[in-house]
Amino acid sequence: MKTKIINLVVVTGMSGAGKTVAIQSFEDIGYFTIDNIPPSLVPKVIELLKHSEETDKIALVVDMRSRVFFDEINDILDQLESNEKLNFKILFLDATDGELVSRYKETRRSHPLAADGRVLDGIKLERELLSPLKSLSQNVVDTTKLTPRQLRKAISEQFSSKQDQSSFRIEVLSFGFKYGLPLDADLVFDVRFLPNPYYDPTLRNLTGLDKEVYDFVMTHKESEDFYKNLNHLIKPILPGYQKEGKSVLTIAVGCTGGQHRSVAFAHRLAQDLKNDWTVNETHRDKDRRKETVNRS
């Protein structure tokens, strides 16, 4: 039986340097993540996940919020280093004192080591306490000049495998405007201007996934022209979204009730995009009218 190797990244560093963004980034690229874990619990988490088939990638934030436990960190790191079943790295996030002070002023939060004092005093104490840990870190990232988006991109590029690079996915969603806009949509397209199958009694109870409705919607010249223009708009911008570190792009297509036109349009778009991208296709309101009729 092949021995399972666990990829472990311990994320640490200065408070305010971007550890929250970092751990979210690891989650986006498929890591199991825990924020603010006491060092003594790290080996126990690894032992639990060693027998799990769900993941072999773990990212854990260990920082001065767990100061009462932090004295144990060196012994724990020695254990991790000696574990042959671990591919172990430390990611240390840093920033200049001036930038950290600025970030604390912007968020109006107190520093964990200076709750009753000046932020700068807390930063200086933390830097002193973390200095040995920084010297052990294989990856030190200065976030002083980085935006959150740039930090996410840097982490994705550094810690993603080739397989993980496909973690960018597209959600193609159809919906009905009468039931509200999807809150998670990045791009919204309105196809209510197209001929409506609802007014054909033979098509009314079908959906855009049925061939009769699909053909009705997509064979009109207005539909062909709009779909062609939509493709010219969407396809060139997708690499840009991926490059900027976005993990999920939701493209929503809406009609009045979300049963006919938007379903047909979203289905065709999803099928075309699947040639080059990882795509999930969802029809939020496709059966809503049928469910309403059945309840009445």
UniProtKB/Swiss-Prot annotation:
The keyword GTP-binding applies. GO terms for molecular function: ATP binding; GTP binding. InterPro entries: P-loop_NTPase, RapZ-like, RapZ-like_N, RapZ_C. Pfam families: PapZ_C, RapZ-like_N. Belongs to the RapZ-like family. Displays ATPase and GTPase activities. PANTHER family: RNASE ADAPTER PROTEIN RAPZ. This is Nucleotide-binding protein str0831. It comes from Streptococcus thermophilus (strain CNRZ 1066).
